[in-house]
Amino acid sequence: MKISASIYSNKEKDLETLVRELDAHGIDMFHIDCFDDSVFKDIARIRAISKTSIDLHIIHPHPESFFTLIDQYKVDFVSVQYNPEIKGDFFRPNGVTLWGLAITLKDSLAVVGSILQRADFALIMASEPGVSGKPFDKANFQRITDFKQQFPQKKVQVDGGVNDRIAFVLRLLGVNSIVSGNYLMKGEYLGVGMLNLHKTPSLQE
């Protein structure tokens, strides 16, 4: 199971220092919440020093407004937060980017099913989108099971309140990647947080 580090969860370190430290510990992806196009300046800074994949989460009523920048910076993964008000395209294949649909418990799989069929993966939001530090809603364990039954070929990423114990269960459920923000960034050592997210807890813990 891969780990995507939510870089904006760390306010103490400058971006370059944080990226180099995460890379030194073998992080799989850098997760960036996108509310406007200012994040692409940070993507450019990351691209200048790292080859690690960019994992962009668009939370905006007009995702198509970012398509040109996504193409320009060759963003590896893009998930678009579902919003029934979105009238244009959710995705634009470019031969590089893998596209996902981000959904919450409020979003019925029956309603978003036709969009999910066109996506490469789903980002299941287990807490409020774009808000760091919120707890994991355990109702999402069943949501993941339901999703995998309905869309067995789709990969699943989970974001929101993921700690080492939650990560253990998500791995058992077949989740492909997790986003870690507070848990990974707020610990004293990044390496310890990475190890804890990867390891299997003992029954005595």
Predicted ranges, named:
Residues 26, 74, 96-98, 174:
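Glycine-centered short loops/turns at secondary-structure junctions
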Residues 1-4, 50-57, 91-104, 150-158:
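Short beta-strand/loop segments at the ligand-binding rim of alpha/beta enzyme cores
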Residues 82-86, 123-132, 173-194:
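Glycine-rich phosphate-binding active-site loops on the catalytic face of alpha/beta enzymes
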Residues 124, 128, 134-172:
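Active-site/ligand-binding-proximal alpha/beta "capping" segment
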Residues 98-106, 110, 120-126:
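Internal catalytic-core helix/loop-beta-alpha segment
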Residues 1-77, 85, 106-119, 139, ...:
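Conserved N-terminal beta1-alpha1 strand-loop-helix module at the mouth
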Residues 34, 82, 103-105, 126, ...:
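Short secondary-structure boundary segments
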